Amino acid sequence: MERLIALDVETTGLEISEGHRIIEIGAVEILNREITSNEFQRYIQPNRKVGESVNIHGITDKFLINKPQFDQISDDLLSFI
């Protein structure tokens, strides 16, 4: 059985050297080239302003205020993968 995980992320920007961070991560499981119903999705508080990237993904600072930080979801993500 071949198992793959497809990941998708939304970020505050592209350059980590400028402090940009992931604000949403999603993943789906693929078994033998078939997408399963097993999926993972979390919004993440980046501890910085979303900035101009809101124009691309529509995720606002206000929406992210009470979301968990990455270290609070990383174990769940690794378990899924």
Which ranges hold each PLM region?
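Conserved non-catalytic scaffold segment of RNase H-like nuclease domains
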Residues: M1-I5, V9-I81
